[in-house]
Amino acid sequence: MEDTIAAISTSTVSSGGISIVRISGPDAIIIGDKVFKSKKNIKLANVQSHTVHFGNICDNGNEIDEALVIVMKAPNTYTRENIVEIDCHGGILVTKKVLEAVLNAGARLAEPGEFTKRAFLNGRIDLSQAEAVIDIINAKNDYALKSSVNQLDGKLSEKIKNIREIILNNVAFIEAALDDPEHFDIDANVDNLKNDVENCLNNADNLLKTCDNGRIMHDGVRTVILGKTNAGKSSLLNVLAREERAIVTDIEGTTRDTLEEMINLSGITLNLIDTAGIRKTDDVVESIGVNKAKKLAEIADLVIYVVDSSRVLDDNDYEIMELIKDKKVLVILNKADLAQVTTAEDIKKIMNCETVTISAKQETGIEELEETVKNMFFNGEVKFNEDVYITSTRHKELLKKAENSLKLVLDGIDNMVSEDFLTIDLMAAYENLGLIIGEEIEDDLANRIFSKFCMGK
């Protein structure tokens, strides 16, 4: 990269103790010297790498702020380029002024994710490691963070590279045998080839088996709270969120649109969606909310169906139970503080599902509710033992393509297909796996991936 880029690496929408303006590229230190006036009257070009210096940031001779400046010289930096980081006071205005000074001194404003993109293009990290950076930033729970850190450390890359190496070794042998059949006996090596492909297929399949837990770890459990009007759905949301997120009244139809809240349950994220109470209504707005609730239930990982246990089941209840009969459902018998009319036995006569009795008003039964959710998803213990989880849809699809190609190779071996045709499917698997770590990537795909990053990263 010939140009030098700069951006604010901390928040641009709120003030803080400090802000960081990052500069990376061949002229980073030169630009740093243009804007930095050291208290010791030293030049950044003359200092050792990975050192910190105190002084003022200036723009055309006008002092903007006191700052600490960190100098990091290539190649031992995040981007493998010269980097200068300016730690200034964390006000929004002063930080923008410092960035303006750097841009006026010759830097170009970085695109979103461009620092990490340069780390990838300069070979410090591969593409899956680069994607792990944004996953670390967006991690919602401890498990997602740990998985992302493992990916950044290269544990996924190592598994992918091991599979690719086995594939490539077999392609090389087949091609050598085709060129020199007198010295390389393909027929004698068929069993070894089949064994290698089966091992590769097994390794790819083991990665794919982590996808479901990986998605839950990364995105959380899509949880829709469903029920009739005034069953206590919004009260339950407030109790689980431990704050007054939803308006609660005795008036039916108070909740007309969805309300979302994220909670952490023993290290796993539940994405709770409170929905409009399901009933027949002539109100246009409420009707839209009811239809939206039904559609959300169709795509939910978990439906929490809240029943007013102080009332008998009616047609609206039966409609809801028909809607969710094929889903993973937890029925909450709410209003245990009142005389119970509908019981767990009544529900289980109609649906095969878990039930918990609570009082959202008195906040009783909530611990049992949380334990039941854990049992439904994690057999009572939230525990992830693998060091690598597939959390990216992109990785999942590429692994599936590679797996399909490897299956075609096995079919070809069993049907005694010509070896040169086997190499076509082997190379297809090799290339799709390479796309995961960026070995075979095209510029437009790389640009799409890095455009999802925040500015300054």
List each language-model region with its residue ranges:
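Switch I (G2) and immediately adjacent beta-strands of P-loop GTPase domains
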Residues: 53-65, 69-73, 253-281, 299-302
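A glycine-rich (often HGG/GG-containing) alpha/beta subdomain
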Residues: 1-146, 150, 154, 330
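Generic enzyme active-site microenvironment
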Residues: 272, 306, 332
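C-terminal-of-GTPase-core extension/linker across diverse P-loop GTPases
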Residues: 3-9, 142-264, 281-283, 313-457
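Conserved catalytic network of the ASCE P-loop NTPase/AAA+ motor domain
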Residues: 13, 62, 76, 217, ...
